[in-house]
From Swiss-Prot:
GO BP: any one term: alkanesulfonate catabolic process
A GO term, aspect molecular function: alkanesulfonate monooxygenase activity
Protein name: Alkanesulfonate monooxygenase
The EC number(s) this enzyme carries: 1.14.14.5
Pfam family name, one: Bac_luciferase
Organism: Cupriavidus metallidurans (strain ATCC 43123 / DSM 2839 / NBRC 102507 / CH34) (Ralstonia metallidurans)
Key word Flavoprotein present: yes
Keywords of the record: Flavoprotein, FMN, Monooxygenase, Oxidoreductase
PANTHER family in the cross-refs: ALKANESULFONATE MONOOXYGENASE, ALKANESULFONATE MONOOXYGENASE-RELATED
Length: 387
């Protein structure tokens, strides 16, 4: 089991939908989150992409220099970059980070944003372009290890004699992650990616997605790994966790929710449509209505695009829900919580000990290896409470 955290390059706060409780997302703050994830033993971090975010490649490059083992899941954007340039970027990042790159193939689903970036393709065309893009990217990096070149002629991508002179550390290329809920997305995942990602839907719906992608991959003689993107709200008791969930959306008003949902409704993303359906386009606002599956809460999606659900509960409950997804075949969990610095610590301290995952080697530290809290009376090292 791999557990990744999240770098909030589009903002961070104690509350959703308001400037109250917000904090400046400077590089110093992003560095705090990354270093925390690195030292706490997270396997990596997802860096988001889009016009609401800082550029993920620049941020990842800067954070790689201040971390030791943390891996970075960074977006490839077909149509916004060429596959050959993207291959060079990926190879260089992988080399300078000593093999710590993971790539996230992002087709995009916000038509207004895509047109603002100069991409005027419909849903089907975007997936065609993405399939051609990632094929060239993969083949080019694989060839780079033997100083080879490739040529490709497609509907959206054509290259002749393409080469990457400095190959990546990882062979044949850094692992490719990809998420999408349409049939076209499932076809692309089955044929070309290493890990298929889904947003946090109820387990029964996730199981159907996994079965479909597996069946499609089998037709190509391939196996695919699976991951899930979730928020987490974990506290020492269930009551405290649900109180924290209520507090997270306590500043929302009807107008703010309606504005956000109007934007989401214009997208042609099947995944976003499925997220919106979980809370009926923002009309479900009570805790009972937003708990769409045991301990799976859709409140985040009232105003946040993309991943809109959170696991809510005490440590044992949240760990049990994670294992429920793991039993379906999920082995990568990409998590986040508000605010991201504090919640990175909280989740690692409360839930990591309960998960069936290999504990990553700790970074070098003090001779007195913790965590043990503050030393008492100048020499007494605290131990776990027996109560």
């Amino acid at each position: 089991m791999q557990v990744l955290w999240f770098i909030p390059t589009h903002g961070d706060s104690r509350y959703l939908g308001t400037s109250e409780g917000a904090r400046e997302v400077s590089f110093d703050y992003l560095k705090q989150v990354a270093v925390a994830a690195d030292t706490l033993g997270y396997d990596g971090v997802l860096i988001p992409t889009g016009r609401s975010c800082e550029d993920p490649w620049v941020v990842a490059s800067a954070l790689a220099a201040v971390t030791r083992k943390l891996r970075f899941l960074v977006a490839l954007r077909p149509g916004l970059m060429t596959p050959t340039l993207a291959a060079r970027m990926a190879a260089t990042f992988d080399r300078v980070s000593n093999g710590r790159l993971l790539v996230n193939l992002v087709t995009g689903g916000d038509v207004a944003e895509l047109e603002g970036d100069g991409l005027f393709l419909n849903h089907a065309e975007r997936y065609e372009a993405s399939a051609e893009f990632i094929r060239v990217w993969r083949d080019l990096l694989a060839a780079s290890h033997e100083n080879g070149e490739i040529s490709f002629e497609g509907k959206h991508v054509t290259v002749k004699g393409a080469r990457v002179l400095y190959p990546p550390i990882q062979r044949p290329h850094p692992p490719v992650y990809f998420g999408g809920s349409s049939e076209a997305a499932h076809d692309l995942a089955a044929e070309q990616v290493e890990t298929y990602l889904t947003w946090g839907e109820p387990p029964a719906d996730v199981a159907k997605k996994i079965a479909d992608v597996r069946a499609r991959a089998a037709k190509h003689g391939r196996t695919v790994r699976f991951g899930i993107r979730l928020h987490v709200i974990v506290r020492e008791t269930d009551a405290a966790a649900w109180a924290a969930a209520d507090e997270l959306i306590s500043k929302l008003d009807d107008q703010t929710v309606a504005r956000a949902q109007a934007v989401f409704a214009k997208m042609d993303s099947e995944g976003q449509r499925r997220m919106a359906a979980l809370h009926a386009g923002g009309t479900r606002r009570t805790r009972e209505a937003l708990e769409i599956s045991p301990n799976l809460w859709a409140g985040v999606g009232l105003v946040r695009g993309g991943a809109g659900t959170a696991l809510v509960g005490d440590p044992k409950t949240v760990a049990a829900r994670i294992e429920e997804y793991a039993a379906l075949g999920i082995d990568t969990f990409v998590l986040s919580g508000y605010p991201h610095l504090e919640e990175a610590y909280r989740f690692a301290e409360l839930v990591f000990p309960l998960l069936p995952r290999k504990v990553r080697d700790k970074l070098p530290g003090q001779v007195l290896s913790g965590p043990f809290g503050e030393v008492m009376a100048t020499g007494i090292v605290p131990i776990a409470s027996q109560s």
